[in-house]
Amino acid sequence: MTTADAETGRPRITRVACRPSGSRYLVFAPDDASPWYRDLLASPQATLEIDGVPHAARAVPLEGDERGFVLHLLEVDAARGRAIADQLLVHHGELRKTLAAARAELDGGPVADRSGLRRELLGHCVTFCNDLRMHHLREDGAFTAIRKAHPGLAPALERLRREHETVSRALLDLDALLQGRGDLGAVREKFERVAAGLEEHFAYEEANLLPALRGSGVPAAPVTPSG
């Protein structure tokens, strides 16, 4: 199970014992100090991997004296699809703003005069990487439910999952450049490649998922936005 760390927002992956209960799962915490238990009290969204398949889940505290949660797996109907589409655009907008803030640091003045540039960029990168990792982990879980509701989206969803892995590796490379003492020109070049790849990823996702989630149809074949 993956939860968002209640203090840092970073993804926390924990192996937990779940008990099926109809279409739901029950998970019990040994004590109040269990990190994942505190995470779910702060934010009830989780990604539950069952037999290698990720599922988006919403955690509801158990009633009575039992310490744990009922995990409701995501199901996509018309109303939920529209809500997912709206939230997707909100998340993409937030991530684009963080990218813009990092680019502003790069464009803020001559590199030679900006001794704090690397530190500032690293701060933006850490924030962005944590947010993006959490976004993609939750998407991977949601994709399972979206594919069940919209089988025609299967090719696009598989491509998006592969791109999540590519983006993760590219961000690790960028982080390594920022942590080191290499040329900041190389940092800018890598940053622009990452930013361009992410924008292409966001645009492809929006072009292929939003029509189906909003009930306006599924493309006959995956759409690759031009431009």
Positions of predicted regions on the chain:
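Small-residue-biased structural context
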Residues: 69-227
